[in-house]
């Protein structure tokens, strides 16, 4: 734990000091992903978070999370210059409209230097519709998503986890977070293997929480590799802490933002 350190929080500050995140997430079939990713971004310390999504999604979660700002997808796309970090893909869906929208977002962000986290359906779309990623991108695939991104079999990835992570970082010119029991974080020069976590994290929605945590750390001006490394640690350690009270069987993804502060306090 001594190797991990949270970003500094100056007392002479305001919400803008700790970054503005725009989260393109959710569709009517995957409403929960937008909530989990957004609340996690706030819980790790981002100063301002906006969710750009469909009307059904916003209607469902806006009363659950009044701290966030809510925009339509189109409003989000028009206002990218107001934000410092972007999270794309959690529950976005893979229908034609989502595919077109994903391409439009990336084309817009290629003009920017702000960090971008791509997760879940964003990765599924990227695998089928390759497009150059913006500078300072982080991708967060599980092994099956990694296999699609690399054009290989799932077994190939499982048999070669470290080399697969390196290949992802090289192919997409990004930081790759290959999510496994011992998640691998790497870029073109560095590789780190996380040693925390348990089966409590093997639940739907857990990856949305991780993506949100990483985006929130980026908002506080952490470099991409360090934000990914710390985000993976906090996520996995939170799973361990929550399991002590709830058991590995009963921890839900929605429990992770609730227990996140305990993992943070351990390294302050």
Task: Indicate where each model-derived feature is located.
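Small-residue (G/A/S/T)-rich helix-start motifs and N-terminal tracts that mark the onset
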Residues: 1-117, 124-138, 147-268
């Amino acid at each position: 734990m001594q190797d991990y350190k949270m970003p500094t929080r100056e007392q002479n500050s305001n919400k803008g000091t700790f970054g503005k995140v725009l989260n393109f997430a959710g569709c009517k079939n995957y409403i929960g992903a937008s909530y989990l990713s957004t609340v996690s971004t706030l819980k790790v310390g981002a100063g301002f978070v906006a969710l750009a999504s469909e009307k059904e999604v916003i209607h469902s979660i806006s009363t659950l999370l009044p701290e966030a700002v809510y925009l339509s997808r189109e409003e989000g796309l028009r206002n990218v210059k107001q934000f410092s970090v972007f999270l794309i893909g959690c529950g976005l869906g893979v229908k034609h409209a989502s595919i077109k929208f994903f391409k439009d977002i990336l084309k817009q962000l290629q003009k920017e230097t702000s960090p971008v986290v791509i997760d879940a359906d964003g990765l599924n779309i990227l695998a089928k519709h390759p497009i150059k990623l913006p500078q300072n991108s982080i991708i967060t695939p599980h092994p099956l998503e990694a296999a699609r991104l690399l054009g290989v079999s799932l077994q190939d990835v499982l048999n070669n986890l470290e080399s697969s992570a390196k290949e992802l970082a090289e192919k997409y010119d990004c930081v790759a977070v290959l999510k496994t029991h011992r998640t691998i974080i790497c870029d073109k020069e560095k590789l780190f293997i996380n040693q925390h976590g348990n089966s409590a994290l093997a639940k739907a929605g857990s990856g949305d929480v991780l993506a949100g945590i990483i985006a929130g750390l980026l908002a506080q001006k952490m470099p991409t590799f360090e934000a990914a490394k710390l985000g993976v640690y906090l996520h996995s350690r939170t799973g361990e802490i929550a399991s002590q009270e709830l058991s590995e069987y009963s921890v839900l993804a929605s429990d992770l933002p609730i227990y996140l502060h305990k993992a943070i306090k351990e390294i302050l």
